[in-house]
């Protein structure tokens, strides 16, 4: 839905915004290493404790989510889980069953999932990206998704990212804050470049 969508001035900035809007100092943020280092630095820099739920390395060298460990490390202070979907740097295009299982856990434990999907247009070798919010109804109701054209189309300097928030309560709280602080207003070139990339950039 159109109203689910908003401009944001960068995904790492968006993560910082979510942390400050939806958590308090001393709350915990779950990450799944090995993962993009700002997932750790941004919560820590904002006075939140980082909880580690490392991926499991399988015998064939692939990785999978460790749900047993997640159940052990998550407690009532855990308010946010930052998901890399597809995963950077492991290169995993998460399947629906995995994402739905994660959604079940986070929804039932009142944990907000921030899904960084900046690499979604770069799934290769027949893999198909599934947005976290489309994995299940619970996923849609407990998540904020971030994306951008910058990685796929090499236009990071344009500074154009977006948020998608299906849940009414989460969206009202997040987007009201963005509006009040004028963080939802793109530069002149950001929407032009973004539309051009997605409509005409397939050959690239």
Predicted regions and their residues:
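Conserved core of the PLP fold type I
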Residues: 1-104, 121-122, 129-134
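Alpha-helix termination/capping residues and helix-transition junctions
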Residues: 23, 75, 112, 137-140, ...
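Helix C-cap/helix->beta junction micro-motif
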Residues: 46, 108-109, 139
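Structured helix-beta-strand junction loops
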Residues: 76-77, 108-109, 177, 200
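Short, Asp-centered acidic motifs that coordinate Mg2+ and/or phosphate
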Residues: 80, 112, 144
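Short aromatic-enriched loop/helix-cap "lid" or pocket-rim segments at secondary-structure transitions
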Residues: 125-128, 157-159
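PLP-dependent aminotransferase class I/II
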Residues: 142-204
């Amino acid at each position: 839905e159109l109203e689910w969508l908003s401009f944001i001035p960068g995904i790492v900035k968006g993560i910082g915004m979510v942390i400050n809007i939806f958590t308090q100092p001393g709350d915990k943020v779950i990450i799944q290493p090995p993962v993009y280092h700002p997932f750790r630095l941004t919560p820590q820099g904002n006075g939140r404790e980082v909880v580690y739920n490392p991926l499991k390395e399988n015998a064939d060298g692939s990785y999978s989510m460790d749900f047993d460990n997640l159940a052990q490390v998550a407690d009532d202070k855990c308010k946010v889980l930052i998901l890399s979907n597809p995963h950077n740097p492991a290169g995993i295009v998460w399947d629906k069953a995995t994402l739905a299982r994660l959604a079940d856990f986070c929804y039932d434990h009142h944990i907000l999932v921030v899904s960084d999907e900046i690499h979604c247009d770069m799934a290769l070798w027949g893999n198909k990206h599934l947005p976290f919010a489309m994995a299940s109804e619970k996923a849609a109701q407990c998540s904020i998704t971030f994306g951008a054209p910058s990685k796929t189309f090499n236009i990071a300097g344009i500074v154009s990212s977006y948020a998608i928030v299906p849940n009414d309560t989460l969206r009202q709280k997040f987007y009201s804050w963005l509006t009040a602080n004028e963080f939802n207003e793109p530069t002149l070139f950001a929407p032009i470049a973004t539309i051009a990339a997605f409509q005409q950039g397939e050959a690239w």
